[in-house]
From Swiss-Prot:
<dbReference type="Pfam" id="PF05128">
    <property type="entry name" value="DUF697"/>
</dbReference>
<feature type="transmembrane region" description="Helical">
    <location>
        <begin position="99"/>
        <end position="119"/>
    </location>
</feature>
<feature type="transmembrane region" description="Helical">
    <location>
        <begin position="239"/>
        <end position="259"/>
    </location>
</feature>
<dbReference type="GO" id="GO:0005886">
    <property type="term" value="C:plasma membrane"/>
</dbReference>
<feature type="transmembrane region" description="Helical">
    <location>
        <begin position="129"/>
        <end position="149"/>
    </location>
</feature>
<dbReference type="InterPro" id="IPR006507">
    <property type="entry name" value="UPF0283"/>
</dbReference>
<keyword id="KW-0812">Transmembrane</keyword>
<dbReference type="InterPro" id="IPR021147">
    <property type="entry name" value="DUF697"/>
</dbReference>
<protein>
    <recommendedName>
        <fullName>UPF0283 membrane protein SO_1811</fullName>
    </recommendedName>
</protein>
<comment type="similarity">
    <text>Belongs to the UPF0283 family.</text>
</comment>
<keyword id="KW-1003">Cell membrane</keyword>
<feature type="region of interest" description="Disordered">
    <location>
        <begin position="1"/>
        <end position="22"/>
    </location>
</feature>
<keyword id="KW-1133">Transmembrane helix</keyword>
<keyword id="KW-0997">Cell inner membrane</keyword>
<keyword id="KW-0472">Membrane</keyword>
Length: 401
């Protein structure tokens, strides 16, 4: 019995072992399959997330880049024009240039020959006449030489502003030390002593790099110069607006604008240490006109929109007041362009003066001017002033008699 029971007792154990081995194999295979499936699922899930992120952000990326490029182009366009407009034109025709040089040399040679022949004839006729002619020619020649040298220096000083602006833009990004001192000294020697210069001298330290020194110079000195130039521009713009509103003739309007703008450009340039001569003034006016014509799109739309809206609203009240407002805004625009061309460091976008603040002051000036002319109180005040002037004049005449 025991012999027969042994096989029956070992067979269940063998079957149980086989079952446990097969179960373990199935569990292992299932685990491997589960691991492989999990890895593939993770890869698929990551790829799906990348596709979703690409779908979400890919369409917006080129739009943002295009907007940045457009903004940078609009911001950089007027500055590039400001620099290039001051520089002498190098693309002029050589044929006209050589003809101009030959013509000038021929005229100078002809003048010299005629002068020598005239002096020789005067010497043969009378030594006293020769002395008189020689003295007159010496005085006129000395005056002409001094004037030419002065005009050349003033024109050269104006043309150097473009190079100074390029150097300032480069030093504003420089982490080196030593070059900014000479750059600042070369500029401030043309400026009068002021509180900004004193604060700059106390603020500059040896451990400051070039970018920090240029930033201090712009914040302490140039900001002070900018405020003074803005006051000059606003004053001349207000005077031009009132004079144009009171002027009855178009020819007189043109003379007033030309006269006031010439004085304004001279005073604005003097704020930045630039003395204008005849040719340098013509060069500056030419550069201003070029910058106004080829101004950036955003700046042009803002300024013209402000000007046209203000002139249209004022024109409904009075055509003469609208004419004065337009002339005042034109004067202010010329003054602001002169500031940009004469400033040794280029304006930043947030620092560039706008016409939106000037037209409010012009409207207030014209409103006060119109009120003095149209209201009864204004007429009574004017009548009182005239009567007082007549009384003072008559009393002076009686005292003299």
């Amino acid at each position: 019995m025991s012999v027969e029971l042994l096989p029956h007792s070992t067979e269940p154990h063998a079957n149980g072992a086989d079952k446990s081995v097969s179960a373990a194999a199935r569990v292992t295979q299932s685990l491997k399959k589960q691991q492989v499936f999990d890895a593939e699922q993770v890869k698929l899930q990551s790829a799906t997330d990348e596709l979703k992120s690409a779908q979400m952000f890919a369409p917006q990326t080129p739009i943002t880049a295009i907007d940045d490029v457009v903004d940078e182009a609009l911001a950089a366009h007027p500055q590039a024009l400001d620099v290039e407009s001051i520089r002498p034109k190098l693309h002029q025709s050589r044929r006209w240039s050589w003809l101009a040089r030959l013509s000038l040399m021929a005229l100078l040679l002809l003048t010299l020959v005629q002068t020598v022949l005239g002096l020789r004839d005067a010497w043969l006729e009378s030594p006293w006449l020769f002395s008189f002619y020689g003295a007159v020619l010496g005085i006129v020649g000395s005056w002409a030489i001094v004037g030419v040298i002065g005009e050349y220096r003033k024109l050269k000083r104006l043309k150097q502003v473009a190079d100074t602006q390029e150097t300032g833009a480069r030093l504003a990004l420089s982490m080196q030390m030593g070059e900014a001192d000479g750059f600042i000294d070369n500029i401030v020697r043309h400026y009068p002593d002021s509180q900004g210069l004193q604060r700059l001298r106390h603020s500059l330290k040896d451990e400051h790099n070039d970018a920090e020194k240029v930033l201090l110079f712009e914040d302490l000195v140039l900001t002070e110069r900018d405020e003074l130039a803005k006051k000059i521009v606003r004053r001349y713009a207000a005077e031009s607006a009132v004079l144009l509103a009171a002027s009855p003739l178009a020819v007189l309007d043109m003379a007033i604008i030309l006269w006031r703008n010439q004085r304004m450009l001279r005073d604005v340039a003097a704020c930045y240490g630039i003395e204008l001569g005849y040719w340098s003034r013509i060069k500056l006016i030419r550069s201003i006109v070029i910058n106004i014509i080829y101004a950036g799109t955003s700046e042009l739309v803002t300024d013209l929109g402000t000007q046209l809206l203000s002139v249209e609203m004022t024109g409904k009240l009075s055509a003469r007041l609208a004419q004065g407002l337009g002339g005042g805004l034109l004067t202010a625009r010329l003054g602001y362009q002169a500031m940009a061309l004469c400033r040794p460091i280029r304006f930043k976008d947030e620092q560039r003066p706008k016409l939106t603040k000037v037209h409010q002051e012009l409207l207030m000036e014209l409103k006060q001017f119109a009120g003095n002319l149209l209201t009864k109180d204004g007429r009574d005040a004017l009548k009182t002033q005239l009567e007082g002037t007549e009384v003072n004049t008559s009393s002076k005449e009686k005292s003299l008699s």
